[in-house]
Amino acid sequence: MLHFKTWPALLTWLGLSVVVTSAGSSYSGSSSTYPKREIANISVIDTPLVRAAERFALQHSNNAVYKHLMRSWLYGVLMINANDTLSRNVDLEVHAISALLHDLGWDSTGNSPLISPDRRFEVDGAFAARSFILDHADGRGWEARRVQLVWDAIALHTERSIAYYKELEVQVVSRGISLDFSGPGFGVSEDDFATIGKSFPKNDLKNQVNESIILLCETKPQTTYDTWMQPWGDNYVKGYNPIGKRRIDLIFEHLS
C-alpha cells in the first residue's frame, strides 16, 4: 500500500491534478469559506445540503450503520486536513455527502424505494444519493460533474483497486471508509481515531456488516456472485450457488 505522503507525487504522475470549482454550489470561494461546525472536536463543513444528507442517512440506516457513516466521514476529514494536496483540492461538500450516503444500498426497511431487485448495493446507493441531491433545492444547482463525483465515490467505494486511482474525492471517500475496518492510517493519528470511536462506538460494526451482506446474498444473490461479497453467501447462506454465474464460467462456456 502506498504511504500517505506519496500521494502528491503519485497524483502528478497519473495526471490526476484536480481543480475544484464552486459552480453550482450555494457557496463560493475556497473551502475555508464554507460554514463549519464541530463533531467529535473535528471541524466539518456545515451546509444545508450536508445537514440534509445526514438526516437522510439517519432515516435510512439503523444505529450501527449511521455510526459507521459518521466515522467514515470524519476519518476522511482528518485525512484531508493532514495533506496539503487534499486540503487544497477536495470538494468538501462532495466528500461529506458521498461519505454520509455511501451505504444507502443497505437500507433494510420494508419495501424501501432505494433498493432495486437487480443492482449491487453500491449502485443502489449511488443512484439514491444522486436522486437526493437533485431533489434538494441546493443540489439542483450543482454542476453535473459534482453529482457524478458523488455517484462514482459511492458506486466504487468497495472497489479500492479502482477507487484509489480515481478523482481525489473518490479516493478519500473509499480510504476513509476503509479505516473503519483497518484502523488508523492515511494521516489519521491513533489519538484522533480513538476520539472518533468514543463519539461513535463501533462495537456493533462486525455484526452489522455480516447481517447486511448475508441479507444481500439471500435476497439478491445475483448481485453478489463473483464479487467480494460471495464468501458470505458461500459460508452462511443455504442454497447459495455461484457456479455457472461467475465470469470464469461464462468465459469458458462461450469461448473455445
Please report, for each region that a protein language model flagged, where it lies by residue.
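Acidic/histidine metal-binding catalytic segments
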Residues: 87-92, 137-153
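His-Asp-centered metal-binding catalytic motifs of divalent-metal-dependent phosphohydrolases/nucleases
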Residues: 91-111, 125, 129, 151-160
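An active-site-proximal "capping" alpha-helix that borders the catalytic cofactor pocket
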Residues: 72-74, 119-136
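Fungal secretory targeting signals
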Residues: 1-26
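Active-site flanking loop/helix segments enriched in acidic
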Residues: 50-68, 73, 77, 105-112
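Short alpha-helical hairpin
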Residues: 34-54
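Divalent metal-dependent phosphate-bond-processing catalytic cores, especially two-metal-ion Mg2+/Mn2+ enzymes
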Residues: 24-35, 60-63, 70, 74-88, ...
